[in-house]
Amino acid sequence: KLYIKTHFCLGESVRVTDWFFIDFVENNGMAWGMSFIGKFWLSLVRSVAIVALIWYLHRIIKQGKHRLVYIFLVALVLAGAIGNMIDSMFYGLMFTASSPYYVAYQVPFGEGYAPFFMGKVVDMFRFPFFTYTWPEWFPIWGGQQGTFFDPVFNFADSCVSVGIIAMLIFCRKELEELGEGKKKSSDKSSSSEKNSSEKSSSGKSSEESARKS
């Protein structure tokens, strides 16, 4: 990321093979350039998610009952999330803004193009494996040409995506146990609330009986 940021103009593209390009783009949003919420709130959500993942990873390592592959995949997702978070936190403070006309360069810390949490994420990999054309009868996209796989992404995006997909495929047991654990804690919480409510109502009944007598 540092090399691309300081050696490529924004939008510059280098062809490696017919199906592999290095394209320098920046985005404010999530993996693969998606964006649904404002930059600040996205960074805040990322921070909370990273803290939660660190806590969870420490917990499952300490428990010592989970498979190594599951621990590795959780760590892989965490590493990817931290990688993109570093861009958001520090790149705006360390570099000038990228432009199609000149290459960004490093500046004294705090004198960059954006404040803390507002930096843009650097993306660079694109794999346009093949093109296709939608059938004319297909709704909305009929007759249009598309490319698989066209989104520009970075290595951190790959860590998050590969980690999550691999967990869904190879770690279903651990994910089911995680879901059952949440359900049990929810049941315990509702049960304790019910018991406290029953105790409160029985206490009130006893007080009323004592007053009547």
Regions found by a protein language model. Name each.
Residues K1-S213:
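Alpha-helical transmembrane bundles and membrane-interface segments of multipass inner-membrane proteins
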